[in-house]
């Protein structure tokens, strides 16, 4: 599925750089945002095929941004995966209940990361 556009919403420079490197090496087009508001505006201008949303962002919670995107008809069905260090018991379930389609824990396991992306970029995808 190379050529698909993936928006990475991440405020940490090193995490953004690593994620971007992995995605580009797999042939994906990477769009970047460092805040939730920047992401929302960018999505309006250039809708991505998939969004990787950090949960903790400087301007608002990534989950608040997910709620805003889910309320908008043009982004309601866009795949959104939480990309987060929140790995306590119950975090995954809470994040999925808040509107994310999937969950990827940091630090990233590259093989699992790519497998998960491919699963959600498949047109016949199912929620995790």
Predicted regions and their residues:
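Conserved acidic carboxylate
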Residues: 10
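The feature encodes the CheY-like receiver
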Residues: 16, 58-61, 76, 88, ...
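Acidic, metal-coordinating helix/loop segments flanking the phosphotransfer/catalytic sites
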Residues: 32-50, 67
